Amino acid sequence: MYVSYLLDKDVSMYPSSVRHSGGLNLAPQNFVSPPQYPDYGGYHVAAAAAAAANLDSAQSPGPSWPAAYGAPLREDWNGYAPGGAAAAANAVAHGLNGGSPAAAMGYSSPADYHPHHHPHHHPHHPAAAPSCASGLLQTLNPGPPGPAATAAAEQLSPGGQRRNLCEWMRKPAQQSLGSQVKTRTKDKYRVVYTDHQRLELEKEFHYSRYITIRRKAELAATLGLSERQVKIWFQNRRAKERKINKKKLQQQQQQQPPQPPPPPPQPPQPQPGPLRSVPEPLSPVSSLQASVPGSVPGVLGPTGGVLNPTVTQ
């Protein structure tokens, strides 16, 4: 393996105190060789240098790599292309001399590395994404953008034109209310009748409010109109007549004074009938006198007889 070769090549590179401290056995035969990867134009050289640097940092108590590195530039990414073998070799040499290959290559972390970088122009290059993100951030944050964001948006936008939002994020333009609302007058044409046509139609309307099918065909052929136009004219004329009659009725009701309501009907009273003579009942004395013939009216005696009246002189 290439790592074993580097360890056996230069023994003076690693201090003996560190190499043999703690009874650590780091013989080359104890290491398991990793699987070989296909050649990607200098990528295996960088991987071997990184493995050697990790081994060196594990054995020596030297200072570790810094936690954060500066943001890589777009020009530095060209070293990972197939044509960047020279830059990778320089990074390996820098790592063998005690430096950090990652710092020499100029990237902060392995996550920032893009192994499938294409140098030629591609229609779906990820460089177009920051323009959409910058436009979205400007929409969420209404404050003035910083100079760095403005410069990045102008640099990444194609043709030097600044794009605030992506096409699929743009809000559709609202049409004006006048263009959305349509009336019948604008959609359909309006027929203008001549004086002769109106006169003949008025004559027919006064003769009959509802025209027959036969008369409608004859009138349409005479006036040079279609049957549909004649039918619609009669419909409009009847609506106009109803409107005129309603207006006249309202005017008459306003001119006449309001009449008081009639009194409610009273229930019928019973009428008195014709007077009839009722016979008076007879007294007991008169009935007795009437029953005795030749008797003189008088008073009954104690014996039950009739007392004759006495005449005094």
Curated annotation (Swiss-Prot):
The entry's DNA-binding region: 186-245
Positions with biased composition (Low complexity): 274-313
Region of interest (Interaction with DNA), residue spans: 186-216
Entry's Gene Ontology molecular function annotations: DNA-binding transcription factor activity; DNA-binding transcription factor activity, RNA polymerase II-specific; DNA-binding transcription repressor activity, RNA polymerase II-specific; methyl-CpG binding; RNA polymerase II cis-regulatory region sequence-specific DNA binding; RNA polymerase II transcription regulatory region sequence-specific DNA binding; sequence-specific double-stranded DNA binding
Post-translational modification note: Ubiquitinated, leading to its degradation by the proteasome. Phosphorylation at Ser-60 reduces transactivation capacity. Phosphorylation at Ser-283 reduces transactivation capacity and also increases ubiquitin-dependent proteasome degradation.
Segments for region (Interaction with 5-mCpG DNA): 228-242
GO cellular component: chromatin; condensed nuclear chromosome; nucleoplasm; nucleus; transcription repressor complex
Location of the protein in the cell: Nucleus
Biased composition (Pro residues): 257-273
Chain segments carrying region Disordered: 242-313
Motif (4S motif): 283-295
Gene Ontology BP term (one): endosome to lysosome transport
Tissue expression profile of the protein: Detected in small intestine, colon and pancreas.
Database matches in InterPro entries: Caudal_activation_dom (IPR006820), Caudal_homeobox (IPR047152), HD (IPR001356), HD_metazoa (IPR020479), Homeobox_CS (IPR017970), Homeodomain-like_sf (IPR009057), HTH_motif (IPR000047)
Keyword DNA-binding: yes
Domain of life: Eukaryota
Keywords, alphabetical: Activator, Developmental protein, DNA-binding, Homeobox, Nucleus, Phosphoprotein, Transcription, Transcription regulation, Ubl conjugation
Cystine bridges: none
Residues where Phosphoserine is found: 60, 283
Function noted in UniProt: Transcription factor which regulates the transcription of multiple genes expressed in the intestinal epithelium. Binds to the promoter of the intestinal sucrase-isomaltase SI and activates SI transcription. Binds to the DNA sequence 5'-ATAAAAACTTAT-3' in the promoter region of VDR and activates VDR transcription. Binds to and activates transcription of LPH. Activates transcription of CLDN2 and intestinal mucin MUC2. Binds to the 5'-AATTTTTTACAACACCT-3' DNA sequence in the promoter region of CA1 and activates CA1 transcription.
Assembly description: Can bind DNA as a monomer or homodimer.
Entry's family note: Belongs to the Caudal homeobox family.
Protein name per UniProt: Homeobox protein CDX-2
Organism field: Homo sapiens (Human)
